[in-house]
């Protein structure tokens, strides 16, 4: 481990000098991970690409020389790899670019990680959703190219960096730059279209999980790994509230005291609805819990309110609730 003896005595770890590199730091999860480490006495370096500057380092993760240069210069004790193409329908349409980011960039990063503890963010979509819940040792069987690309990314990470950790998470939401940034927060648009009825999926079961909670888990894992180099392999983290997108949308309406009578549950998947999704890929998360590394998930209504209140159309609501 750069900077001190990885896995050695605790006395050798000097808190101000703990360094973490966060890839995809401009993205939905990456921003939360970067903030979590930064706010807890870590020297954090975030990198991105299209949206990197001026706050983060611009780095092309497909450029081995660039990746090597960043790691050798910063010498991180921990790397959290959040960068990914995480939109299943986009992966289907732009497969080559998605595979480059979701698979080949993983291989590059893992090869160059050196003594750093590497956490790779993966997905519940590595499972087919036919026999939940899924434990860390259950056999993956992804239904779509996104799930296949993330599974290949896992394999590249663990092949080139056997001491790495894979953290699988479900559908995510959190503080967004625009509501379309998350498949959960985008449902707010349906809520605020109160004048027109709209149908919303009421088939597929989801476990919407707050990015701030995932970020806390990443920091817990990182801090444990500095003391215990046996922390490696596959882990699961998920919120426990089970909802369809219809139920999420109704919960969002309730959180903002908005009507939901215009929302209509759709109980059959329409033909041509994009990439196939698993019916219920619930993650069983006992490994993190047994190690004392899990965190209690933030209740959905609280977290979604914190995430979406800046996008409320009626500005008077903010004054009523927050003042």
Swiss-Prot record:
Keywords: NADP, One-carbon metabolism
Native species: Danio rerio
InterPro entries xrefs: dTDP_dehydrorham_reduct, NAD(P)-bd_dom_sf, RmlD-like-bd
Keyword NADP among record annotations: yes
Family to which this protein belongs: Belongs to the dTDP-4-dehydrorhamnose reductase family. MAT2B subfamily.
Chain's role: Regulatory subunit of S-adenosylmethionine synthetase 2, an enzyme that catalyzes the formation of S-adenosylmethionine from methionine and ATP. Regulates MAT2A catalytic activity by changing its kinetic properties, increasing its affinity for L-methionine. Can bind NADP (in vitro).
Transmembrane segments: none
Binding partners and assembly: Heterotrimer; composed of a catalytic mat2a homodimer that binds one regulatory mat2b chain. Heterohexamer; composed of a central, catalytic mat2a homotetramer flanked on either side by a regulatory mat2b chain. NADP binding increases the affinity for mat2a.
GO BP terms, alphabetized: one-carbon metabolic process; S-adenosylmethionine biosynthetic process
Protein name per its UniProtKB record: Methionine adenosyltransferase 2 subunit beta
A GO-annotated cellular component: methionine adenosyltransferase complex
């Amino acid at each position: 481990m750069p900077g001190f003896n990885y896995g050695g005595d605790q006395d050798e770890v000097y808190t101000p000098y703990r360094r973490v590199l966060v890839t995809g730091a401009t993205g939905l999860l990456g921003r939360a991970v970067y903030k979590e480490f930064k706010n807890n006495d870590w020297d954090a370096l975030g990198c991105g690409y299209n949206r990197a500057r001026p706050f983060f380092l611009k780095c092309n993760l497909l450029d081995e020389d660039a990746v090597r240069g960043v790691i050798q210069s910063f010498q991180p004790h921990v790397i959290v790899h959040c960068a990914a193409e995480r939109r299943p329908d986009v992966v289907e349409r732009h497969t080559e670019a998605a595979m480059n980011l979701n698979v080949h960039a993983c291989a590059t990063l893992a090869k160059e990680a050196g003594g750093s503890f590497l956490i790779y963010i993966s997905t519940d979509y590595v499972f087919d959703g036919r026999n939940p819940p899924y434990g860390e040792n259950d056999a993956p069987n992804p239904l779509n190219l996104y799930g296949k690309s993330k599974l290949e990314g896992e394999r590249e990470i663990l092949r080139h960096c056997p001491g790495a950790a894979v953290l699988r998470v479900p559908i995510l939401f959190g503080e967004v730059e625009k509501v379309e940034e998350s498949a959960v927060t985008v449902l707010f648009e349906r809520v605020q279209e109160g004048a027109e009825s709209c149908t919303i999926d009421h088939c597929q079961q989801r476990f919407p999980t707050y990015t701030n909670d995932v970020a806390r888990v990443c920091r817990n894992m990182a801090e444990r790994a500095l003391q215990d180099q046996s922390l490696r392999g596959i882990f699961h983290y998920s919120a426990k509230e089970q909802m369809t997108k219809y139920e999420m949308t109704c919960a969002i309406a309730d959180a903002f005291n908005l009507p939901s009578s215009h929302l209509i549950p759709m109980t059959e998947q329409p033909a041509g609805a994009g990439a196939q999704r698993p019916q219920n890929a619930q993650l069983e998360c006992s490994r993190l819990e047994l190690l004392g590394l899990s965190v209690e998930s933030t209740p959905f209504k609280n977290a979604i309110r914190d995430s979406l209140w800046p996008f409320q159309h009626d500005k008077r609501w903010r004054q009523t609730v927050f003042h």
